[in-house]
Curated annotation (Swiss-Prot):
Annotated source species: Chlamydia trachomatis serovar L2 (strain ATCC VR-902B / DSM 19102 / 434/Bu)
Entries under Pfam families matching the protein: OprB (PF04966)
Membrane topology: Multi-pass membrane protein
Domain of life: Bacteria
GO molecular function: porin activity
UniProt keywords, alphabetically: Amino-acid transport, Cell outer membrane, Ion transport, Membrane, Porin, Signal, Transmembrane, Transmembrane beta strand, Transport, Virulence
Stored Gene3D superfamilies: Carbohydrate-selective porin OprB (2.40.160.180)
Membrane-spanning ranges: none
UniProt signal peptide: 1-22
Protein name: Porin AaxA
Length: 461
């Protein structure tokens, strides 16, 4: 019997023997985005509370009688019966009709991000006479600001069935990133930084989510198979999504991560209590970039593994989440070193207007220059009760730089301080000026700081 068969059998057996209550309000990047976008201007559903804003869509707690179970064509009939023409065709009405009739949620995020930076030319130290023949002369990189990033991220979740046997949900999320003029990777080289100035430093296309989830009755267990990324759970509300919160590489994701941007696999999620969640899973180790879905890699017998634990308490101050992620990646041609990494995240609402968060993460090996990071920050949402999209945030990240992974690094550390203000313009459009200050750039000993100015325009439908 092969390893794949044993692992899949164990996951299925555990899913059927677990009988605990399902967990709620645990952060998931794409599910939260769908939930947030589909509650804008929602006049039918009640106004979501602070706790619901971080929830995944809850499952039915009672078994549905066979006489009330929906047929295969029921969503089509229900959608026609909504009679959109009578109520006026609009984005809100269309999304509400899809949600009510077909159990479908759709989110479209499109952002344009110009970034100005200084310095613009990298520094090449002069070699002394004793260095000739022993040290290579560093190449000088020059970049002309601004660099323009165009990022499009559509997401969708479709409830295929909802019966006494549970609920089946298909979820997809795709990220497409293009650049005009310079890209962020070139700008980072010119500034001589260890970390990038945004989450996607070069042109990318990522199938970050292409999964089917079987949620078992009574919210006990869920089993997910397909292509997914650990970026979806590794973080908190504002330090894991460049289109919503912070922009810099160290504050918009886990900068030490060596796991895939999207790869085929499966994971099982179990909830011992309503406020805790446990997850264990595996992925194909070969697909690092996630730019396509590579079914043939599953037969190559190399897999990455992860375990995840989350606690989401609710106290007198507000809801919070505290999580730990452990993962192991295998050595493959696309990543020539086996690594083991960890990420500890904490977030807490101090009040309905103030959200604080922190992260400590690290990784073994020499895959990327940053091997440890410590970050913390705070975000105030809708401080003046003007627009639900209004945000004010400030955060700081301290990054340790592994000199073996970055031979040109002159310092063992690099610090970034970032602040942004999102200004909502109606329910869908927002603008966010952002400022990044880098203290002691790791690759530039002759400069003590570098600066990045950005203005993010985001359309979230």
């Amino acid at each position: 019997m092969s390893f794949r068969s044993v692992l899949l059998t164990a996951l299925l057996s555990l899913s059927f023997t677990t009988t605990m209550q399902a967990a709620h309000h645990h952060y998931h990047r794409y599910t939260d985005k769908l939930h947030r976008q589909n509650h804008k201007k929602d006049l039918i559903s009640p106004k979501p509370t602070e706790q619901e804003a971080c929830n995944t869509p809850s499952l039915s707690k009672e078994l549905i009688p066979l006489s009330e179970q929906r047929g295969l064509l029921s969503p089509i009939y229900d959608f026609i019966s909504e009679r959109l023409c009578l109520h006026g065709v609009s984005v809100r009405n269309l999304k509400q009709a899809l949600k009510n009739s077909a159990g479908t949620q759709i989110a479209l995020d499109w952002s344009i991000l110009p970034q100005w930076f200084n310095p613009r030319v990298s520094h090449a130290p002069k070699l002394s006479i004793r260095d000739f023949g022993y040290s290579a002369h560093q190449t000088v990189t020059e970049a002309t600001p601004p660099c323009w990033q165009n990022c499009f991220n559509p997401s969708a979740a479709v409830t295929i069935y909802d019966s006494s046997y549970g609920k089946g949900v298909f979820q997809i999320s795709y990220t497409l990133v293009h650049y005009w003029r310079e890209n962020a990777a070139t700008a980072g080289d010119a500034m001589m930084l260890a970390g990038s100035i945004n989450d996607y430093p070069s042109r990318q296309n990522i199938f970050s989510q292409f999964t089917f989830s079987q949620n078992f009755p009574n919210e006990r267990v869920s089993l997910t198979i397909g292509q997914y990324s650990l970026y979806a759970i590794d973080g908190t509300l504002y330090n894991n999504d460049q289109q919503l919160g912070f922009i810099s590489y160290a504050l918009s994701q886990n900068p030490t991560a060596t796991y895939s941007s999207g790869s085929l696999g499966a994971y099982l999620q179990v909830a011992p209590t309503a406020s805790t969640s446990l997850q264990i899973g595996f992925q194909d180790a070969y697909n690092i970039s996630g730019s396509s879905i590579k079914w043939s890699n599953l037969t190559k017998n190399r897999y990455n593994f992860h375990g995840f634990a989350s606690w989401a308490p609710r106290c007198c101050l507000g809801s919070g989440q505290y999580s730990v992620l452990l993962y192991v990646t295998r050595q493959v041609p696309e990543q020539m070193e086996q690594t083991m990494g960890w990420s500890v995240n904490a977030s807490q609402y101090i009040s309905s207007k103030l959200y604080v968060f922190g992260r400590y993460s690290g990784v073994t090996g020499h895959v990327f220059p940053i091997n440890r990071t410590y970050s913390c920050g705070m975000v105030s949402a809708n401080l003046f009760n003007r627009n639900p999209q209004d945000l004010f945030g400030i955060a700081c990240a301290f990054n340790n730089v592994h000199l073996s992974a970055s031979p040109n690094a002159k310092r063992k550390y690099e610090t970034v301080i970032e602040g942004f203000a999102t200004i909502g313009c109606g329910p869908y459009l927002s603008f966010a000026p952002d400022f990044q200050l880098y203290l002691y750039p790791a690759l530039r000993p002759n400069k003590q700081s570098a600066r990045v100015y950005s203005v993010r325009a985001n359309l979230a439908i």
